[in-house]
């Protein structure tokens, strides 16, 4: 039993736009508040981490890639305003996206790229684009704007990675940590 022809094209276009990270009319505006949605991206990130853990001494990058620190000081996080949390999440997503694009370039320039690594890098890029779109629909601002009641936002802590294993571990930890904490709080505040 298939999808009627009159619905097939709109569904296909919707899935295409979502995979590109573009907003889709008719998409539930708070889809990220459904825990199953975020868990799907976390699961994909964890799979990529698990695949690359077996090759800890696998391909190294020619240069180190900058990624966000994923450690969370829960006391400091709880005292931050949701706007400050949003800034930290956007900065982290931006660093991750840039690092994963650099990893994609490493694979593209490799003489024998691993199809499995390429698949997980492509999924990570698609996932980050979709998460960006879902966060915009939640009302999170992409621009790292300092909240009006603070004079300055503490810059996001960063460090560097030199392997796919470390990159995917950071990606997985960031989604399970800061992103999940932020969306949980933003969704709760939006329900009030």
UniProtKB/Swiss-Prot annotation:
Glycans are attached at residues 50, 64, 109. It is found in: Secreted. PROSITE patterns: EPO_TPO (PS00817). Disulfide bonds join 33-187. It holds the Pfam family EPO_TPO. It comes from the Eukaryota. GO terms for biological process: erythrocyte maturation; erythropoietin-mediated signaling pathway; positive regulation of cell population proliferation; positive regulation of Ras protein signal transduction. Residues 1-26 form the signal peptide. GO terms for molecular function: cytokine activity; erythropoietin receptor binding; hormone activity; protein kinase activator activity. GO terms for cellular component: extracellular space. InterPro entries: 4_helix_cytokine-like_core, EPO/TPO_CS, EPO_TPO, Erythroptn. Keywords: Disulfide bond, Erythrocyte maturation, Glycoprotein, Hormone, Secreted, Signal. Gene3D superfamilies: 1.20.1250.10. Belongs to the EPO/TPO family. Hormone involved in the regulation of erythrocyte proliferation and differentiation and the maintenance of a physiological level of circulating erythrocyte mass. Binds to EPOR leading to EPOR dimerization and JAK2 activation thereby activating specific downstream effectors, including STAT1 and STAT3. This is Erythropoietin. It comes from Spalax golani. The lineage of its organism: Eukaryota, Metazoa, Chordata, Craniata, Vertebrata.
């Amino acid at each position: 039993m298939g999808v009627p022809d009159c619905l097939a094209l709109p569904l296909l276009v919707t899935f295409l736009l979502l995979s590109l990270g573009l907003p889709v009319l008719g998409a539930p505006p708070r889809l990220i508040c459904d825990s199953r949605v975020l868990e799907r991206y976390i699961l994909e990130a964890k799979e990529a981490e698990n695949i690359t853990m077996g090759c800890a001494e696998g391909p190294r990058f020619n240069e180190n890639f900058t990624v966000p620190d994923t450690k969370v000081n829960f006391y400091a996080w709880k005292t931050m305003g949701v706007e400050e949390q949003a800034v930290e999440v956007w900065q982290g997503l931006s660093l991750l996206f840039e690092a994963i694009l650099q990893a994609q370039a490493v694979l593209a320039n490799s003489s024998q790229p691993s199809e499995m690594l390429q698949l997980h890098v492509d999924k990570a890029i698609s996932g980050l684009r979709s998460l960006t779109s879902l966060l915009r629909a939640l009302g999170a601002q992409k621009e790292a704007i300092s909240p009006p009641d603070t004079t300055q936002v503490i810059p996001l802590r960063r460090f560097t990675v030199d392997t796919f294993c470390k990159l995917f571990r950071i990606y997985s930890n960031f989604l399970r940590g800061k992103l999940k904490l932020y969306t949980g709080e933003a969704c709760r505040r939006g329900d009030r």
